[in-house]
Design a protein with these regions (language model features):
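Conserved alpha-helix in the HATPase_c
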Residues: 2-10
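Conserved beta-strand-loop-beta-strand hairpin that lines the nucleotide-binding pocket
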Residues: 6-7, 16-67, 72, 79-111, ...
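Aromatic/hydrophobic pocket-lining residues that form π-stacking "cages" and hydrophobic walls in ligand
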Residues: 11, 73, 123
Length: 187
C-alpha cells in the first residue's frame, strides 16, 4: 500500500468484520518513530489462526484464498527495522475482554518508510460507513494531540443526528484538519 493510513483502514475493516462495536486507533509519533496501535472488541482469533495471520495465504475470507492486509502492514514495519505484534482473545478465552490488538513500530528515518498519508480521509471514510461503531482516535505528535471520539460525539448530538450525515462528516473533516494544522502536520 502506498500509505499507512490505508493499512489502518484495512485493519479497521477487519475489526468490523469480526463484529467489533468499539475500535481504538492510536498513533504516537516522534521525530524518529511512528507507533500505531489498533484495538477492537471483536470476536478475536484463536491461537492456531493467530500464528498464521501474517502469512498472505492465511485468510478468514471465503471469497479468496489470500489475505494481504496484515502481511503488508508487517512488511512495511519490518522493512524500516520496526515490528508488528498481534494479541487476540476469543470470547471463549476471555468473555469480558475479547478482541484483537495490533501494534506496530516504524522507524521514520529509514529510506523504506511508508508515509502515513491522509488520516483525515481515512477516518471520515470509516465513520461514513460505520456510524454505529464507537471509534476512538488519537494521534500524538509535536507535543500535541489530534483526537476523535464518536462516543462523545453521540452524547453531544443525541440519537436523532446520525454521525454519517453530511453535516457531521464535514465537521469531523474540518475539525481533524484544524487539529493537524495546529500541530504543523503537513499532508
Amino acid at each position: 500500500m502506498k500509505e499507512l493510513s490505508l493499512n489502518i483502514l484495512d485493519i479497521a475493516q477487519n475489526s468490523l468484520a469480526a463484529g467489533a462495536g468499539h475500535i481504538r486507533i492510536e498513533l504516537e509519533e516522534t521525530e524518529k518513530t511512528l507507533s500505531i496501535t489498533i484495538g477492537d472488541d471483536g470476536w478475536g482469533m484463536d491461537e492456531a489462526f493467530l500464528k498464521t495471520v501474517t502469512d498472505p495465504f492465511s485468510t478468514s475470507r471465503t471469497t479468496r484464498k489470500v489475505g494481504l492486509g496484515l502481511p503488508l502492514f508487517k512488511m512495511a514495519a519490518e522493512q524500516t527495522g520496526g515490528w508488528l505484534h498481534i494479541a487476540s482473545r476469543t470470547p471463549e478465552q476471555a468473555p469480558e475482554a475479547h478482541g484483537t490488538l495490533v501494534t506496530t513500530l516504524f522507524h521514520k528515518e529509514h529510506m523504506d518508510f511508508t508515509p502515513l498519508g491522509d488520516m483525515v480521509s481515512t477516518l471520515t471514510l470509516l465513520l461514513q460507513g460505520t456510524p454505529e461503531v464507537d471509534i476512538h482516535f488519537s494521534h500524538t505528535l509535536n507535543g500535541g494531540e489530534v483526537s476523535l471520539d464518536t462516543g462523545q460525539m453521540r452524547e453531544v448530538l443525541g440519537p436523532d443526528i446520525p454521525l454519517n450525515s453530511p453535516e457531521v462528516l464535514g465537521w469531523v473533516k474540518e475539525s481533524l484538519l484544524e487539529g493537524y494544522r495546529a500541530l504543523g502536520y503537513v499532508f
